[in-house]
UniProtKB/Swiss-Prot annotation:
GO terms for biological process: mismatch repair; pyrimidine dimer repair. This is DNA mismatch repair protein MSH6. Pfam families: MutS_I, MutS_II, MutS_III, MutS_IV, MutS_V. GO terms for molecular function: ATP binding; ATP-dependent DNA damage sensor activity; damaged DNA binding; mismatched DNA binding. The gene is MSH6. Belongs to the DNA mismatch repair MutS family. Component of the post-replicative DNA mismatch repair system (MMR). Forms the heterodimer MutS alpha (MSH2-MSH6 heterodimer) which binds to DNA mismatches thereby initiating DNA repair. MutS alpha recognizes single base mismatches and trinucleotide insertion-deletion loops (IDL) in the DNA. Is involved in a UV-B-induced DNA damage response pathway. Heterodimer consisting of MSH2-MSH6 (MutS alpha). The lineage of its organism: Eukaryota, Viridiplantae, Streptophyta, Embryophyta, Tracheophyta. It is found in: Nucleus.
Amino acid sequence: MAPSRRQISGRSPLVNQQRQITSFFGKSASSSSSPSPSPSPSLSNKKTPKSNNPNPKSPSPSPSPPKKTPKLNPNPSSNLPARSPSPGPDTPSPVQSKFKKPLLVIGQTPSPPQSVVITYGDEVVGKQVRVYWPLDKKWYDGSVTFYDKGEGKHVVEYEDGEEESLDLGKEKTEWVVGEKSGDRFNRLKRGASALRKVVTDSDDDVEMGNVEEDKSDGDDSSDEDWGKNVGKEVCESEEDDVELVDENEMDEEELVEEKDEETSKVNRVSKTDSRKRKTSEVTKSGGEKKSKTDTGTILKGFKASVVEPAKKIGQADRVVKGLEDNVLDGDALARFGARDSEKFRFLGVDRRDAKRRRPTDENYDPRTLYLPPDFVKKLTGGQRQWWEFKAKHMDKVVFFKMGKFYELFEMDAHVGAKELDIQYMKGEQPHCGFPEKNFSVNIEKLVRKGYRVLVVEQTETPDQLEQRRKETGSKDKVVKREVCAVVTKGTLTDGEMLLTNPDASYLMALTEGGESLTNPTAEHNFGVCLVDVATQKIILGQFKDDQDCSALSCLLSEMRPVEIIKPAKVLSYATERTIVRQTRNPLVNNLVPLSEFWDSEKTIYEVGIIYKRINCQPSSAYSSEGKILGDGSSFLPKMLSELATEDKNGSLALSALGGAIYYLRQAFLDESLLRFAKFESLPYCDFSNVNEKQHMVLDAAALENLEIFENSRNGGYSGTLYAQLNQCITASGKRLLKTWLARPLYNTELIKERQDAVAILRGENLPYSLEFRKSLSRLPDMERLIARMFSSIEASGRNGDKVVLYEDTAKKQVQEFISTLRGCETMAEACSSLRAILKHDTSRRLLHLLTPGQSLPNISSSIKYFKDAFDWVEAHNSGRVIPHEGADEEYDCACKTVEEFESSLKKHLKEQRKLLGDASINYVTVGKDEYLLEVPESLSGSVPHDYELCSSKKGVSRYWTPTIKKLLKELSQAKSEKESALKSISQRLIGRFCEHQEKWRQLVSATAELDVLISLAFASDSYEGVRCRPVISGSTSDGVPHLSATGLGHPVLRGDSLGRGSFVPNNVKIGGAEKASFILLTGPNMGGKSTLLRQVCLAVILAQIGADVPAETFEVSPVDKICVRMGAKDHIMAGQSTFLTELSETAVMLTSATRNSLVVLDELGRGTATSDGQAIAESVLEHFIEKVQCRGFFSTHYHRLSVDYQTNPKVSLCHMACQIGEGIGGVEEVTFLYRLTPGACPKSYGVNVARLAGLPDYVLQRAVIKSQEFEALYGKNHRKTDHKLAAMIKQIISSVASDSDYSASKDSLCELHSMANTFLRLTN
């Protein structure tokens, strides 16, 4: 049997005579296949595979192909509707009798018995045949085109162009004699023009609308009259009309009538459409045969820009990956490759931007595309509309709204098929789509993978289009569409898109000024703007940085921006290299300086206009030059006003803000963001004045080497300090914890306040903490939800009034609003219940956090207002807010008016009862007619002459009086006003909610801090071994910083995870009175040196964020910065070797470390010659000991350093203890004790590590011998050199002292210099 074929997503014109949406990009007639008429009226022309495979989605095994490959149709999925099956003899087609020349069926070929073999040969080639598909229970028409004698199989080409290799003797077939389908087509084609004239003249709804109705069946998007195209496309439209006649055999009047009826229904839903869409999105492409093509240029999809290293020094350009990223392959290549390469040369070798610049032009803009006029002329209106959007946004995937579906065409369809797993629709043009309800899911998938998405929405309905054409005389046949959103990693705002990722997604705008742009050795001046769109937070700052961009590296490592905005070709090479090195594949946007990336003056002007519009300020406060006049800056936020008055000190920060606002304006987020933006100052990161900071500095190297947020395995959270401490229950708490870890406290009093709070939240108060966590456990991300409420009152982007959406967005908004109110109420109640702990213990920080009116706002009155305003449960269920009386003045007034008219109608009823003398007269409603006065038939003679008879039935008549008609008109208008007020009530209530924005944000902030404090209290329970509250003390009386730990464990590593029993704690003491400030640490490889260094650093961080430390005792004077040089790695993307990377990090430490810093150097000097490495290591160590005089650890395998510093009181020699045993072949076996022990270790025992690594025994034994030889040589040369040096030094001293022979002493000094070099060389 033939392989399963992908089901065809066709629809029968009997259900809807409109063509598929694939005709939106219909090909010209010259390239289209001749359509074959179909006699079937079936609702869906989907062919089920003939195979008996019980799972129709799983194709049956394909038969062996014939030796001669049949010529396949290069366009198996043309624009023509899928073929309709021919009915079997027992189920004749309802339209079959309408053919003027009925076909002659030469008998049905039954399935032959197994003992009978029917064979066919060349005699049936060219004949018409019908093949029965058992699972479809239908017949399909085709013709035999080829016979393979070797296989004994015939190739049958069906009417839709698909081919199948069959053994006709084993198939159920019918042989057809009579009029060929081609003749039938030609006969029908003669009547096409007349039909088309009737259809288009009688109904102005255009073919584009037909396309969209076919998909949504409730959209009526009325787009394009494809028949009125130029050249060959007219012929195509005529042929399409012929298909309608052949498949429907309907009278022209019936066609027009049905079309008119369908286009009048805007919200109709089609079951057939659902089946079609389900097939195109869910089912996989089966055995559909595709023609293969040797195409040279293939259109690719669009991937996001990524940061790549500059190709050479001074080159700041970055490669924008666009068309080259998603290469067609497999079926897509065979199906679309040839067409794409032939039709779109302007996307390949003839590529130009909108200003007709070639890619080789230095000002070439890859975001835009020049469309050749000849190409544009051949486009229909709908096609032209799509290409106009695409040509301006070539770096984005276009979600093009057509009815209830978002469509992806051409190169964007390849992205949808690849990344969203959406199947291509039928047709030669790449095309796929998905329903409106899947918008959030699909757009998040693309954005998370690094794509930019342009959302094009309909802003006009078909009825509005028709009305516009009548009123203005416009000839437009396409509904209006507008760009309503640009969604990227940094502009995700929808709650559904952010549910799985509580981390802040920062969009970072960065600019640079000063001498560093021309002088590589000069210091850098940066302006930075960080925007978290989801929480409406804007962080602004300007700072100076060293030539290695250390502060910028720290900022990038902490914030990890997902998107970067920078002025094109402005940043220095060092800055570009830092971005490459310290980011994780962000989306990079290069804006044109000044026109797109604004300077400070332009920024103040543009932002000022926005705030003036928000505050309803008159525009006259600005001069024609765009400068603020008088006190025009008073409406700006305080922070922006201060930056504007600082002149040069704030100009770069304002410029960065300008770049961010311009970018957000393209995404329709600028005004909604600024309206309720929360401005913050950039955390101080100038390392030269670190003592002015309120926080400890953890630079990029420390964050990475200590694995604070990212592990070294895969960059995830597992095994990091953040993962260990993160037991937060709220999303805002998780984000706050990351901030605390990135910037631990430096102020002693603030640290103690946190420690007090953490201590109180456990122990006997643990039940209160658990209850607090339980209350918050089901809350959504309240910080983002509140921000979304703030932005929802701005009718812009997809929230715009003109946007045509079929999803009930109003109901969704009401439900989110109620969720926000309930969340705020829950947070307030949780904080209130936690206040009970203050009765037992006191903590300044907790008292401040839990006292209403201080950090905790008093929101009880606000919550009561909204509870009294409407029923939350009813509103959440219905999606409509019905306000209680007194909640909304406008609605109350409308209700009162309605009641007045209803009261007047009741009064009028009483009057009529009295007039006619019958109390049984009453109002009734019949159909849409209300307030019909129902009068008994016996009183018909007494009815006044001005009564209007509306209807009657046996025994009664129904009337309208003039008064009733007048009151009904007024009542209808009053009800309309009431409904209008009801529709806007939710927006007014949200507006009142936004009036208290500071309260809601304070509530979230207080709740988040309490959540983090409880998390720190709980996290200490997971430590292995004991824990203690660290003692934070000032320096000793002589001003020497100190650190002391007893029984210090590791906060992250546990013995059970290591699989070696319990973790070995250690005692550490550095600094303080009469104590060495540095530990020179030696020991065997794998002895635990690096682990000890890390655990000390992590313990200091824990102590200064207010958490407990895994130790018996821990005391430290505050550390202002932790400087870490640890691990071996290179930065190839930044052009740095391992050794250069180590020295670069060390250079930063040398220039930035202070007396209060903690310096950790792990095996500095490796990666180069031993002499060079040891010389550098000793020089660096000496600098920290003698010049900086800070606390620190220096681990090394240069054992000569231990000899040199064994008498230095500022250095404590220690090693990681081990036991040595004799192994096989003289190889020493080392047992690691992991205990910090005083004294130096004589060896590193590297051969033991080689043994553990599994090196062969003969290699190990040879290594032992070589090791002994090197040690013997070192000892001999060492003793020999010492004797020679001693003799020479005595000679020099004697010679210089006597001063008798200057030339001799000079020669002696030269010899001493030579001997010193020899000594250094031999001792290494």
